[in-house]
Amino acid sequence: MERKITLSKDDRMNFQNTLDNLKSNSKWQVLKTYLIEMKIKYPSEYFICTELSNTYHMLGMYKESEQASMEAMQLEPNDVLVIYNYAVALYSNEKFSEAIVQLNRILKRKINTIAYGVHGEGMKWAMSIKNDSLYLKAICQLNLGKLKEAYKLIVKHLAQRRRGVYSDFTKKQVT
């Protein structure tokens, strides 16, 4: 599926700068308003929907997070970040089996495809999102009462953690 870009290069840079600034200052409510406005202005930009999903999640608005993620999935179902954010939204709404299905879509992909494919952002990012998918799958398994599977995934997640590779989860959360 070819991505239809509706934002100009300058608009994308301004968007990314605003996004980074509001995130780094934890201005989630302001970011939510900004993203809703951008979504109205650019309805075919899946990245806006997936960022809105993430923002809703940070605000504890899990139903809205899932809805925004579903919209992003309809626009671009093959972007690993979109899939991951959708899995997080499903997990947050206690849809653990559905989240596992999405996480498996990420985990089955080759690391080089994630890193350097159409939506890739490099090897460190690919390693990060794939490893965090392992941990999130483990937590879903745990919630489904599948302790052995969860334990194996957590051990694998911890073994693959590396300096310089970001994780959404601290070691304290994992252990």
Give residue spans per PLM region.
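Conserved structural position within tetratricopeptide repeats
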Residues: K39-I40, M70-Q74, R105-K108, W125, ...
